[in-house]
Amino acid sequence: MNRLKNNENCRLLLKILIIFAISRLIMLIMVPVYNGIMGTHRSFLFLMNEWDAKKYAYIINHGYTHPTDIDPQANWAFFPLYVIMCAALKAVTGGLINTYVIGMIVSNICIIIAAFFAVKGLKKQTSIKEEYTMIMPVLLFMAPYTFYCSSVYTEAMFIMFIVLFFYFLFEKKYMAAGIMAACSSGTRIVGCILVFALVVQLYIDMEGTKISFGKVKTFVMDMLKAPKKILSVLVCPLGAFAYMAFLNFFCGDAWAYKNVQIAWREDEYFPIIGVLWKACTGQIEPRYTYMGWFCIAI
């Protein structure tokens, strides 16, 4: 017992679990508050798993929509790694646990792991005081819209893989970082862009922070002599490529995850600026307006 008390990782995990428990207790308290205000009798599971959570639950139970299905909103837009993990856990439990509970267990475990390694990374890579590093789990568990990280959504798993990617990257464990990037790209398509962070960090570690034609040339030559580093880069988008290969086999369109999204919306926005402008001016759904103003505030 004394060894556990003196173990830094155990102490950190205990602090994170206490913050996590408080945050989830607040969520539970909000259920009767919501029902009292709205005059409803909805359960915690119902309130926590709205919108796309139902799509993920369907995929966990039944798999992806067959190409001959009449539903125009085919669920190919949802990447598979989170679903695979949930389906595996459901299989292990013999299907006795509600699908939404399974998904929430996976999401909550993922966000706890993310918080743990985020704090560890901050301690190793910065001079921030220890008490200030605990702001990270508070934000991950209690910030607006972090309820998604407790629901049947990919957010928690995606955040976990991103945190682990940067944790291993700064530990110079490039292959482990590449695998985390591959997992993130199998969770959400934007995980593919982590390959650029890996290449930049490799350049900094091998050539320093200054950029010149000569140094770039040297970097390329050095990389060609280091097959493990090249492999760590090539692995990064593997999750997305694997899903695209599946879609090509399953429905004949490797880009189906992108093409099917027209069934949800036809409008196109200029990245970041266009979305924020339309969100903050109330041109899209109210929930995006709230998120838009929150993004500007932080």
What are these regions (language model features)?
Residues 126, 130, 165-176, 206:
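Membrane-interface transmembrane helices that cradle and orient dolichyl/undecaprenyl
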Residues 1-10, 212-219:
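Short, Lys/Arg-rich, polar N-terminal cytosolic tail immediately upstream
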Residues 23-35, 39, 184, 195-298:
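Membrane-lumen/periplasm interface segments of specific transmembrane helices
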Residues 88, 105-126:
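Transmembrane-helix motifs of polytopic, lipid-linked glycan transferases
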Residues 97-101, 118-142:
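Transmembrane-helix signature of polytopic, membrane-embedded enzymes
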Residues 50-65, 71-95, 274:
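Short hydrophobic/aromatic helix or loop-helix immediately within or flanking a transmembrane segment
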Residues 110, 130, 134-169, 183-194:
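Multi-pass, polyprenyl lipid-linked donor-dependent membrane glycosyltransferases
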